[in-house]
């Protein structure tokens, strides 16, 4: 049996998560299905993402950090403990690009101390995320500087950054992006087109919120 931890570089997996408080998450979705169901969807997807991440943590391929919005530090600590995640940080203010850059800076010392080479960012909007998605990302970061998982809405569901990028914060591809637009992925690619960075795409995935809506309407969620 292959011991992946011996042949692959360890990564820090940062999960960008939002507290699933009533009326405080998935605001656009809340208008369609109600605040209670919207909060329930957020909770289900967060728990699924955490469970998937832990499957790689258990084989020592990743350390997990959860970057939280929607709560103060004290409640973030409490929630991360409930989720079984030891390491957490507040996302802070700004656009998504600014928040991700902040997480890189905050975690830089931790990465050096723990000999972590790469940083991978994921959100909690992908119900069909599986451990193979993350394992493939870690494998591809051996040969590439940047990994992107395109989504059906013109953005991406994952971004993986190699040591070459994060060590000096050079050419961070998600800076100066107009988020929530259809060309987020293309703008990200354009940001490093002039560099010699190597990149690769993962398979395109659907942001399957609608599937969860149907399950709720059919009373299939616990």
Predicted regions and their residues:
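N-terminal nucleotide-binding beta1-loop-alpha1 segment
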Residues: 1-29
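Short beta-strand/loop segment that forms part of the nucleotide-sugar
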Residues: 62-71
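Short aromatic-hydrophobic micro-motifs that form the base-stacking/packing surface
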Residues: 118-122
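Short phosphate-binding loop-to-helix
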Residues: 77-117, 178
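Short, glycine-/small-residue-rich phosphate/pyrophosphate-handling segment
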Residues: 166-191
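A short, N-terminal amphipathic alpha-helix
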Residues: 40-59
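Conserved donor-nucleotide/metal-binding helix-loop-beta segment in metal-dependent transferases, i.e.
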Residues: 127-155
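Conserved alpha/beta core of the MobA/IspD/sugar-nucleotide pyrophosphorylase nucleotidyltransferase superfamily
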Residues: 183-222
